[in-house]
């Protein structure tokens, strides 16, 4: 997947989650798939672009939800699972297929 296509996918998910990221960056990250700043800047690992659809979707939705919910509480996890299931992405534990 190209960087442009990935950023388009992030924006499609952003509409679904009803948030607007201020910036989307792709770069090499050694320890995690992504991060979200308090200012609305999303940064994704370049390696994520090579992962299966479900893994990418989970990382994208996870970071977008952090724009509304800064923690991993019940609401956060419920919404994460609902958004993924609504798009037909199977949710199993920490990974999505």
What residues fall within each predicted segment?
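Active-site-proximal or metal-binding-adjacent scaffold patches in catalytic folds
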Residues: 1-58, 67-97
């Amino acid at each position: 997947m190209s960087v442009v296509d990935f950023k388009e996918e992030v924006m499609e998910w952003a509409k679904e989650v009803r948030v607007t990221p201020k910036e989307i960056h792709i770069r090499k990250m050694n320890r995690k798939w992504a991060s979200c700043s308090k200012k609305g800047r999303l940064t994704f690992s370049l390696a994520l672009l090579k992962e299966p659809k479900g893994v990418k979707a989970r990382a994208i939705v996870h970071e977008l939800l952090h724009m509304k919910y800064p923690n991993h509480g019940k609401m956060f996890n419920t919404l994460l699972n609902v958004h993924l299931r609504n798009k037909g992405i199977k949710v199993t534990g920490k990974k999505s297929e």
